[in-house]
Amino acid sequence: FQLADAYPWITGVVGWVDLEAPAVGEQLDRYRQHPKFRGVRATAENMPDSDWLARPSVRRGIRAVAERGLTLDLLVRTEHLPHVPRLAEENPDLRLVVDHLAKPPIATGELARWRERMAALVPYPNIWCKVSGLLTEAGPTPTAEAIRPVVAFALEQFGVSRLLWGSDWPVSTLAADYVATFRTLLEALGPLEEADRALLFGGNALRVYGLPAGDSPGGLRSAP
């Protein structure tokens, strides 16, 4: 929490805990003592077992997150998505955020399975998706044209009310700098009503992460 304490514009922290640890609840309770703690990220992508999210020990940890009114971010790829609906069903009050739109394989263009599995999440109203990290999945052509199909699909399936923008900084700098990343997404999105833009670039994050009204995560009001 050092950075959150040092910079007032950091209004919320999504941290990491070992979801399989027997004392995960105690660790969450310690973190909750910090006023900016908002949730946990489950890094399924980093696990060698693609069924990691289905483990009983992990699901117990996720229940502990849900019981404390926290948000669960999911760092997943296409192969992990079949387990997400079960998490939503078992924890209907848990706010789930699929980071980076589950990292669609933009570079290969093999999106059929990703589309199918993402569409299966739509019926669950407690699942949101973070529009972030796309240019780094686009291979040698990190352009608006490259990411437009997945952005359009996300808007069509989930609607703007269930999408949150994220910069994915500093990882995003592997493909483009901060300003270029932001502007490329704007180009890929195309025209948006002002109200929809406000939701995507801040309003939805305020609601999902329970941030104080009037805050602007990451300085979005001054974004280019």
Tell what function each PLM region has.
Residues F153, Q157-L164, T173-P224:
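Mid-to-C-terminal alpha-helical segments outside catalytic/metal-binding sites
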Residues F1-R68, L74, A112, L121, ...:
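Mid-domain alpha/beta scaffold segments of enzyme catalytic cores
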Residues T11, G15, G39, R95-H100, ...:
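Short hydrophobic/aromatic-enriched beta-strand-loop microsegments
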Residues E26, R30, H83, R117, ...:
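Alpha-helical elements of Rossmann-like donor-binding domains used by nucleotide-donor carbohydrate transfer enzymes
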Residues V13, V40, V65, H100, ...:
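Conserved, mostly hydrophobic/aromatic
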Residues W52-L164:
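Catalytic pocket-lining loop regions of alpha/beta-barrel enzymes
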